[in-house]
Amino acid sequence: MSSPSSRISSINNSPNPNLRKPSSRRESLDQPSNAQNAPIPDDEHGADLPLTMSASVVLTSLPRDAHQALADAEAIDTGKVTVRFQPLASAPILKNRVFKISASQKFETVVNFLRKKLNCKDTDSVICYVNSVFAPRLDEGVGGLWRCFKTDDQLIVAYSMTPAFG
């Protein structure tokens, strides 16, 4: 069991202002009557906490790796990309399978070009897969697809007239 003096000191150190009793009459006169006006004490160990995302805007400079990664991500794709078309299932075969396209173009341009080469009607469907794995969105950049999924410096686009993969 705790002694009365230790109980009083723990009450005086309590964060709850209702439990805290003034140690002297003079202290009670010096305190403001409203505890809400009291200033919040500074936190000495707050500097050890990791930065939050909202605090990261305060940084004056980025680490070199992060700066380079952001510069690479913001770079506009320039130059040409080699695209190799591979037919799947019963899709017609192109005479020439390798073409070059500007890296700044959207994947929609690749699909429209392929439809034109295959002499497709407006009602015919052409489904394109990158590396026979996934069908990219039409608004994906060709340069970004090439950077991420190239094989032997070519973007491999498999195509089919019907869905080939589940």
Curated annotation (Swiss-Prot):
Alphabetized UniProt keyword annotations: Autophagy, Isopeptide bond, Membrane, Protein transport, Transport, Ubl conjugation pathway
Subcellular location: Preautophagosomal structure membrane
Region span, Disordered: 1-47
A Pfam family annotated for this UniProt entry: APG12
Signal sequence coordinates: none
Top-level taxon in the UniProt lineage: Eukaryota
Role played: Ubiquitin-like protein involved in cytoplasm to vacuole transport (Cvt), autophagy vesicles formation, mitophagy, and nucleophagy. Conjugation with atg5 through a ubiquitin-like conjugating system involving also atg7 as an E1-like activating enzyme and atg10 as an E2-like conjugating enzyme, is essential for its function. The atg12-atg5 conjugate functions as an E3-like enzyme which is required for lipidation of atg8 and atg8 association to the vesicle membranes.
Assembly and interaction partners: Forms a conjugate with atg5.
Protein name as annotated: Ubiquitin-like protein ATG12
